[in-house]
């Protein structure tokens, strides 16, 4: 109903003109670095609106979630994966690695690789900070990186691989006030092989049963001062980033690419991230409750309507009446 009312106050008109394709591939001011800086500037300006104070109050450290998603496309410019299709083109993909501040739920760092690139390469891009804890899936397991994090006093939580080799050096007691889902809390040592030099790294391994998913998980971490159930709870925060990727793929799908090289694709993906960020800011700043999908649909339909967006979204009926009277 709101979108229909907005149509009645449209005072801009589109004229039939020949569509000129913008060259995303070669436009100097619109290269990926420029767009990524714009994304960062918007996040810095409006991050306080997106921030969830409950997470900040519960944790003394800055929690950052790391994950990746693969965007499939028929490409020859990136390293190809999979079989060739009927038309002879190889199905390639670009993988988007993102870092999300747990209290903001929008990417603060994005890095692109070919779909075939191993996830753990992204860990080299992360900034080490003694006040930060990174949370990532087991696809990012890299003992060399874990040793570097530990030496730099940077925390991490991840899942251990099924085929991981380790030695249990200590079994910690589980206090009565610890969540009953904690099944074990152990100190382990793993072997780190860095350029032929082998060392031992001490880590913490926690086994936890999650009632919601009805399965057990094994986590490894270098957080020796945290409660075992807190470490398990930290990892559960990581599932927020999966919801972000799902939200983008459902509401802002990259079905069509406007250029045929890596530069153009990166720019287009960054534009989607910026749109997602701006809509998130609008949604969070409104008193009236809007679902994200309805908000996206509204903006898509009325992109060329001349209306005060936030004013209209707060009270569509009232704003429509005022505009029709004028």
What are these regions (language model features)?
Residues 1-46, 53-62, 66-79, 84-326:
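Single, function-defining residue in the core of a domain
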């Amino acid at each position: 109903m709101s979108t229909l009312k907005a149509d009645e106050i449209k005072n801009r008109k589109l004229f039939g003109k020949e569509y000129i394709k913008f060259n995303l591939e070669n436009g100097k001011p619109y290269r990926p670095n420029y767009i990524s800086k714009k994304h960062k500037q918007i996040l810095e300006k409006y991050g306080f609106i997106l921030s969830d104070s409950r997470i900040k109050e519960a944790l003394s450290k800055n929690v950052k979630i790391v994950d990746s998603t693969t965007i499939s496309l028929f490409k020859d410019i990136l390293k190809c994966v999979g079989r060739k299709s009927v038309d002879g083109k190889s199905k390639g993909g670009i993988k988007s690695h993102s870092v999300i501040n747990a209290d903001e739920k929008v990417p603060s760092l994005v890095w692109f690789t070919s779909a075939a690139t191993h996830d753990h390469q992204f860990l080299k891009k992360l900034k080490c900070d003694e006040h930060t804890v990174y949370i990532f899936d087991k696809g990012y397991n890299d003992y060399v990186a874990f040793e570097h994090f530990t030496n730099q006093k940077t925390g991490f939580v991840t899942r251990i691989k099924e085929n991981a080799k380790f030695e249990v050096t200590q079994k910690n007691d589980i206090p009565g006030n610890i969540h009953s889902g904690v099944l074990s809390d152990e100190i382990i040592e793993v072997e780190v092989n860095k350029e032929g030099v082998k060392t031992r790294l001490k880590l913490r391994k926690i086994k936890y049963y999650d009632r919601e998913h009805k399965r057990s998980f094994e986590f490894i971490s270098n957080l020796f001062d945290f409660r075992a159930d807190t470490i398990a709870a930290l990892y559960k925060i990581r599932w927020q980033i999966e919801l972000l990727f799902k939200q983008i793929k459902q509401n802002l799908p990259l079905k069509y690419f406007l250029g045929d090289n890596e530069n153009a694709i990166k720019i287009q993906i960054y534009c989607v991230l910026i749109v997602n960020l701006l809509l998130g800011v609008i949604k969070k700043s409104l008193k009236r409750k809007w679902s994200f999908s309805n908000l996206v649909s509204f903006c898509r339909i009325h992109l060329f309507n001349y209306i005060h967006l936030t004013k209209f979204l707060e009270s569509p009926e009232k704003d429509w009446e005022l505009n029709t009277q004028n």
